[in-house]
């Protein structure tokens, strides 16, 4: 058709995010059966056009949640979702004591969670937040039949993992853990530049 499609999630162009996909595709983890992912902020509702359904559509889920979902779904080849059970709330954004200026306009989610069954028998446990009474929604875990991968609590929407990743597996029938160090990026380009060059 002469058309070119580029999936423009900038974190996909980070060397450490790419390592997640390489680990999964290498077979290091074996068949993946469970993923836990998400993220969020203790306080971080952006305001402006982000908090109104007419201009944003949805809140934290679309603003930052899409990056966590893409990080893991891209790594496992985007299997089709079969069923979704989801929940959302707006306890913080609508609270005038916390957000006196914006609470009256706030009509999107500031927290969302979902339990998603994917093709291939994979379970995806997802949660995302703009505001919560917690410092993190937890690390990302990818569990396979041969090994598991822990990705430290990440702000993947900024294009980074939260620290060295760890792989858990058995060696000679003993449980071991080893670290995947943070990789340096020698390209000399930012994520946006890499995205443009890949198009």
Indicate where each model-derived feature is located.
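C-terminal glycine/acidic-rich active-site capping loop/insertion
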Residues: 88-91, 96-105, 113, 118, ...
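Short beta-strand-initiation
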Residues: 109-111, 137
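Predominantly a Rossmann-like dinucleotide-binding segment in NAD(P)-dependent oxidoreductases
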Residues: 3-6, 11-105
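Short, well-ordered coil/turn segments that N-cap beta-strands
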Residues: 2-5, 31-33, 110, 120-124
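Beta-strand scaffold of nucleotide-dependent catalytic cores
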Residues: 32-35, 125-128, 151-153
């Amino acid at each position: 058709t002469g058309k070119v499609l580029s999936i423009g999630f900038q974190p996909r162009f980070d060397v450490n995010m790419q390592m997640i996909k390489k680990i999964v595709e290498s077979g290091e983890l074996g068949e993946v059966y469970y993923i836990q992912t998400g993220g969020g902020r203790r306080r971080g509702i952006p305001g402006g056009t982000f908090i109104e359904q007419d201009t944003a559509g949805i809140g934290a889920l679309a603003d930052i949640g899409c990056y966590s979902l893409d990080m893991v779904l891209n790594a496992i080849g985007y299997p089709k979702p079969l069923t979704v059970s989801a929940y959302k709330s707006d306890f913080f954004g609508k609270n005038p004591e916390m957000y006196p200026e914006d609470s009256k306009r706030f009509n999107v989610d500031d927290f969302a969670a979902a339990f998603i069954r994917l093709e291939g028998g994979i379970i995806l446990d997802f949660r995302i937040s703009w505001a919560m009474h917690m410092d993190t929604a937890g690390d990302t875990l990818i569990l396979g039949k041969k090994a598991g991968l822990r990705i430290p609590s990440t702000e993947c929407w900024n294009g980074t993992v939260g620290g060295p990743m760890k792989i858990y597996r058995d060696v000679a029938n003993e449980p071991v853990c080893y670290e995947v160090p943070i990789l340096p990026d020698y390209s000399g380009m930012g994520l946006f530049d890499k995205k443009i060059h890949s198009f």
